[in-house]
């Protein structure tokens, strides 16, 4: 994303004049989420200043700051003290989506481990991240009826998921 991210963290890049992070905060609030944890690493001070406590959006935001970029799982583990004991929704703030977050907040979706939102493979990731076999996420090397060598059964992680805290224990 350089040069766009040379002085701006990806979550603060704008789409239609609005930062990506704000798009998510507003849509999450519209889905009924009022308590959020925002993870910040690269240029974290800008994200901290932008979010504040969340009051301007009618939500409560707690900030988790990574000492250095830890990738998705590392950032979640760092934020665990703020996330509590119930399943929680994770949205990568550097994506733009019209996904209906409320669909993941239903009790029948709350996982014992994790529930990943997968999408068709984009051109830049044709091999995908996972195979989906019998509604179970599997490593991309496993194939269902499509057979070995077929990419038909592979999908890409969207950056949206619901996790149970035990998944990271």
Region locations from a protein language model:
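A generic secondary-structure signal marking the coil-to-beta-strand transition
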Residues: 11, 59, 86-87, 114, ...
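Short alpha-helical oligomerization interface
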Residues: 6-10
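Conserved core of the sugar-phosphate nucleotidyltransferase
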Residues: 73, 97-169
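Conserved N-terminal catalytic core of the sugar/cofactor nucleotidyltransferase
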Residues: 13-14, 18-92, 101-103
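A phosphate-binding catalytic loop at a beta-strand-loop-alpha-helix junction
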Residues: 1-4
């Amino acid at each position: 994303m350089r040069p766009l991210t040379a002085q701006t963290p990806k979550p603060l890049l704008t789409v239609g004049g609005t930062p990506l992070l704000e798009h998510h905060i507003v849509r999450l609030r519209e889905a009924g989420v009022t308590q959020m944890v925002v993870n910040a690493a690269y240029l974290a001070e800008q994200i901290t200043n932008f979010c504040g406590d969340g009051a301007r959006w009618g939500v409560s935001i707690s900030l988790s700051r990574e000492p250095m970029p830890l990738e998705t799982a590392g950032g979640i583990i760092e934020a665990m003290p703020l996330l509590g004991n119930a399943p929680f929704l994770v949205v990568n703030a550097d994506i733009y989506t019209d996904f209906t977050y409320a669909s993941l907040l239903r009790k029948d979706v709350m996982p014992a481990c994790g529930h990943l939102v997968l999408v068709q493979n984009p051109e830049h990731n044709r091999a995908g991240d996972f195979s989906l076999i019998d509604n179970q996420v599997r490593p991309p090397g496993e194939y269902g009826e499509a057979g070995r060598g077929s990419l038909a059964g592979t999908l890409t992680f969207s950056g949206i998921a619901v996790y149970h805290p035990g998944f990271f224990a």
